[in-house]
Design a protein with these regions (language model features):
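Conserved short loop/turn motifs at secondary-structure junctions
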Residues: 56-58, 153-157, 313
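Buried hydrophobic side chains on well-structured beta-strands
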Residues: 52-54, 83, 111, 150, ...
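Short amphipathic alpha-helical segments and helix-helix/interface helices
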Residues: 42, 66-73, 98-103, 135-138, ...
Length: 361
């Protein structure tokens, strides 16, 4: 029986106005489900759920979300629960009931922090309290010994060596690891998204810099893992992971969220069983190696690259990853080393992302 890793935005509301938001349009007119629908879905499908990461919008704005966390922990303790928060968690748990649900029910926390500079982060997130909330939540997680990750956007605006050094210093101070999510143009490659799309050169330079100064502990990216580390990593999108939007829509990926990629809704009875037994996802996510990859040394390991990037840039899997620098005629003879680490994260194997650990003194 397949066990799914689920990313779930239970509500569409958010208290920030991020310049780069990948879900703003989708959340704008969302008809959100509520607690009864959430519980019904979990009750019917719990045997098929390995983990849940609660992401966009900001779940901590709704007390019912804390009730859901408590319900799942009490009834299905085998399901690992994680939260990605913009930092508002620290504000929400000033309520004792919410604090108890967090302490008892949440196994790990990702805190969004894109800049080590408070003013820059506040401007980037469109919220003057953004930096303070993030730091307060890091302190909260350290206090209650929750495994914590600083997650930062991989964009042309914030990926610099100076900012990387600052973020790693903050992570070290609070005993956290880090994770970089490459920016995705979910509403198309246009004048707005081009401001944030990170260049190949900037991205690879950042990875090489981090590998020398700190530790890369996991690289869940089919393209970059292949030619930077010589390791094969399968894209989990739609295979072991799915995304649930606030209106209950199910998609194969965090970033494939428009109508073209919706395959079902959690209000449908026994929906995870239905998805597994049908070809709903395999119609969208199927290993397709583009003809332009023929003869590449990484043709079978990379297999064309990351699914969501190919869809977002080109609308098809018949074209290779937009970050592919070209056909490799030989394998990398100086690969980046992935440092063995005992960390556990629901995001490791859930979506294409890269994890880091600050170097010890």
């Amino acid at each position: 029986m397949r066990k799914w890793n689920i990313g779930w935005g239970t509500i569409s509301h958010c208290n920030m106005n991020c310049q780069f938001c990948y879900s703003k349009y989708r959340r704008k007119n969302s008809k959100d489900l509520g607690y009864a629908d959430w519980v019904r879905f979990v009750d019917e499908n719990h045997e098929k759920i390995n983990s849940i990461n609660y992401g966009t919008g900001e779940n901590t704005l709704d007390e019912s979300w804390f009730d859901l966390v408590a319900y799942i922990r009490n009834h299905y303790p085998e399901i690992r629960q994680a939260l990605t928060t913009n930092g508002h968690l620290a504000e929400a748990v000033k309520d004792e009931k919410c604090l108890n649900a967090f302490i008892e029910g949440i196994d790990e926390v990702d805190v969004s922090l894109d800049f080590c500079d408070a003013q820059k982060h506040a401007e980037f997130r469109g919220q003057p309290e953004a930096y303070g909330w993030a730091i307060d939540t890091l302190a909260l997680c350290e206090k209650y010994k929750k495994p914590t990750t600083i997650v930062f956007l991989g964009s042309e605006k914030n990926v610099s060596r100076e900012n990387i050094d600052g973020l790693f210093s903050i992570a070290k101070e609070y005993g956290a690891i880090l994770r970089m999510n490459m920016y995705r143009p979910t509403e198309g490659v246009n004048d707005l998204s081009k401001q944030f799309i990170i260049s190949y050169e900037t991205f690879v330079d950042a990875l090489n810099y981090i590998a020398k100064q700190h530790h890369i502990i996991s690289m869940n990216d089919a393209l970059f893992s292949s030619f930077l580390t010589n390791e094969t990593v399968a894209d989990p999108s739609g295979d072991r992971s799915i995304r649930i939007l606030a209106d209950g829509s199910i998609t194969p990926s965090t970033y494939l969220i428009d109508e073209n990629y919706i395959v079902a809704n959690i209000t449908e009875p026994n929906v995870l069983d239905k998805i597994e037994k049908s070809n709903m996802l395999t119609n969208l996510i199927v290993k397709t190696i583009p003809s332009e990859c023929k003869g590449c040394a990484y043709e079978n390991s990379c297999a064309g690259g990351v699914y969501d990037r190919r869809y977002l840039w080109y609308g098809t899997l018949e074209k290779k990853d937009p970050y592919c620098p070209g056909v490799f005629h030989a394998r990398n003879n100086q690969p980046i080393e992935i440092t063995a680490s005992d960390f556990v994260s629901v995001h490791d194997g859930y979506l294409p992302t890269i994890f880091f650990r600050p170097k010890e003194d």
